[in-house]
Structure formats: structure tokens, C-alpha cells
Amino acid sequence: MQNSILVLGGAHIDRRGRLDGPTRMGASNPGRWLEEPGGGAFNAACNLARLGHSVRLISPRGGDAAGEQVSAAAERLGIDDCPVVFLDRATPSYTAILEDDGNLVIALADMALYDLFSARRLRARTTRESLADTRTILCDANLPAETISA
């Protein structure tokens, strides 16, 4: 993918629950649920692909169904998906509960896997080749500082 845009960073599962009425703390609340791939790097890669750019995505994922869901969504958009898979970990996720007007009630960001995406991971052969094969790199600033500076 010579001259592609390389996007490096977060690609995870976003979950949003939206309540049908006012929040009743400490009780079950009726509402709707939406689950889809997201994350800063994933969303940027999707938008670049929609604009017609050749895009390669490198992001840490777990060896689970959620990681496969992110990969499948990227591939549907024509993104060259190159996940760094941690087989013994879960793919990161963000879960938000929203009031009926869209305001956030509470959220859970399960993003610990991103902290394991160290500069050493960038030295893997396939990642090095991807970095060498591109002129433009977009990097998610939520990655560890040592990874970004590498």
C-alpha cells in the first residue's frame, strides 16, 4: 500500500445505552442499546477511507469476538486492517449510559490494553514494514507517550 495513510491507535467496541425516560438510580431502566466499533484511530481511519484514501490501521486488540468485529468493520470499508493481537486479553471497550436527552449518566472505559501497546510492539517486522511503506502517519494521542515518540 505505497503512499497509504497509516493510522495508529485505538480501535475498540463502543456501547451506548439510552434510557427511554428519566434516570431512576438503583433501579432497572428501560432503554435501547447500540454496539459498534469505535475508537479515535478507528473512526479516523473510517472517515479517511470514506473520503477515498488508501488507509492502513494498526491497533491493539484482544483475541476475542470483539476484536474480530472491529476487523470485519474495517475490512468492509476497505481499510487494510493490521491488528496487534494480544490473545490472552479482551479487546478494549467503552460503555456509556445516556439519559433520554442524550446526556451522559455514567461510562466505563475498559482501555487497559492500550497501555500494553509499547514502542517494542512497533519493532515487529510487519509493523516496521507498514511504517516504512507510508508517508503519512496519523497517531492516536491516547497511546503511551513512549509509543508515540517511537
What are these regions (language model features)?
Residues 1-60, 65-75, 106-107, 145:
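Glycine-rich phosphate/adenosyl-contacting loop at the front of the ribokinase-like
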Residues 61, 86-87:
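Residue-level "edge-of-site" marker
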Residues 51, 77, 89-92:
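Short, basic and Ser/Thr-rich N-terminal targeting/leader segments
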Residues 95:
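C-terminal catalytic lobe of FAD-dependent flavoproteins
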